[in-house]
């Protein structure tokens, strides 16, 4: 199954990166069969290291982006709204910035654009980007509550659209029973 998500990066990326972007067609493409997501690390705004394993039990929407990437910038408000819509269901949008300047670059970016629901997560050395096999930005990987990659999308998307939110909910699986009661 694939959901339309807007224009691809193909025109903006050279060589193999363009081929990879065209390969997803700007659509959320399910990973069939699902594969165990690789271990990857990133840091928070204070420089503390985290990994995907820290979020086991939560659904993850891992977005690899940068402030210098126009399609990335364009989709950030939708990712912020998606995080607001999904937070109570135990789904975390991890927007991992690859900006080398880290917090000094991303914090004012968030403030200037009114990004309020996304955490400030950093991947300035590209460790998560390499581990997830991203060949262009933005790349987004949906990981279920058990740590399995369920889908990915290369290019920007309207993450807050009802059909995209429904797809994310279906792919990550239902929240634990105790979350349903709150």
Feature-to-residue mapping (PLM):
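N-terminal export signals
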Residues: 1-20
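N-terminal "domain-start" segment that seeds a small globular fold
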Residues: 21-52
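Short active-site neighborhood of thiol/selenol oxidoreductases, capturing the structured segment around
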Residues: 52-70
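Alpha/beta-hydrolase fold active-site loops
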Residues: 59-60, 91, 138, 148
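Conserved hydrophobic packing residues within short motifs/helices of P-loop NTPase cores
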Residues: 60-62, 94-96, 141
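Non-globular targeting/processing and membrane-anchoring segments
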Residues: 174-182
């Amino acid at each position: 199954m694939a959901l339309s998500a807007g224009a691809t990066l193909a025109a903006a990326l050279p060589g193999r990166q363009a081929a990879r972007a065209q390969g997803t067609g700007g659509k959320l493409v399910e990973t069939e069969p699902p594969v165990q997501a690789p271990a990857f690390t990133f840091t928070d705004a204070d420089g503390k290291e985290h990994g995907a394993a820290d979020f086991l039990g939560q659904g993850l929407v891992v977005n690899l982006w940068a402030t210098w990437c126009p399609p990335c910038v364009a989709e950030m408000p939708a990712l912020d709204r998606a995080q607001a819509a999904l937070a109570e269901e135990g789904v975390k949008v991890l927007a991992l910035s690859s900006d080398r300047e880290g917090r000094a670059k991303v914090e004012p970016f968030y403030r200037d654009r009114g990004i309020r629901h996304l955490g400030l997560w950093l991947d300035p050395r590209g460790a998560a980007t390499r581990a997830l096999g991203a060949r262009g930005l933005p790349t987004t990987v949906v990981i279920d509550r058990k740590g399995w990659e369920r889908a990915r999308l290369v290019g920007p998307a309207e993450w807050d659209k009802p059909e995209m939110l429904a797809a994310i909910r279906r792919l990550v699986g239902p929240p634990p029973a105790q979350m349903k009661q709150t």
